[in-house]
Amino acid sequence: MAEHMMMSMSHGGTGLQSYRMGVSGLQGPPQHGQHVLRTLPAAGQMMPYGGAGMDGAMRPRPNLSGQMSHHQMQNAMMFNGPSQQQQQYMGPVGTQQLMASMHLQKLNTQYQGHPLGMSNGPMGAGAQQYRVGPSQHPGMQHMPSPALTLNVMDTDLIDEEVLTSLVLELGLDRIQELPELFLGQNEFDFISDFVSKQQPSAISC
């Protein structure tokens, strides 16, 4: 029995050797030729795959170091030569600040009669002071204190004139189907409408 196993193993070994010879030399009967053609791409894929795996393991390291040096160069450019970066960064931020200040000036001119309305002087000074250093993002610290306190007071004290002007601007006065805006009035209106609708039906019945 052991001899039979040894013979089968040796036969398998010779089969493997002949199979390897068939792969390397493209020799053998036509049946083995089909197997060779089927396994040849796999064998061809395994060798370059191993080589690519080694190269792939080696390639990211130079790429990573290259990227690191590139980022370090960018950081060095940002920190060593900030004038170019600030000039590039100043263009869109300046236009955005200009548009925002123009919008605020329009809003302020609408409410100039308001006692807490801001004058154009502190806001313009705040916008100019913010535009001087656009790279410093916390602009609330750089704004002057009167404008900041006026903004806080404006947001805290909202009177009915401001609310009615907003309602008129948004056209909410023309919309009658918003009970959450006029909740106190609509409750009584609903009761009176309900009673007035029920009375004619009671009379007709």
UniProtKB/Swiss-Prot annotation:
One of its GO terms (biological process) is response to estrogen. It comes from the Eukaryota. It is found in: Nucleus. Coiled coil: none annotated. The keyword Ribonucleoprotein does not apply. InterPro entries: CITED. Keywords: Activator, Nucleus, Transcription, Transcription regulation. One of its GO terms (molecular function) is transcription coactivator activity. GO terms for cellular component: cytoplasm; nucleus. Acts as a transcriptional coactivator. Enhances estrogen-dependent transactivation mediated by estrogen receptors. Belongs to the CITED family. This is Cbp/p300-interacting transactivator 3. It comes from Gallus gallus. The gene is CITED3.
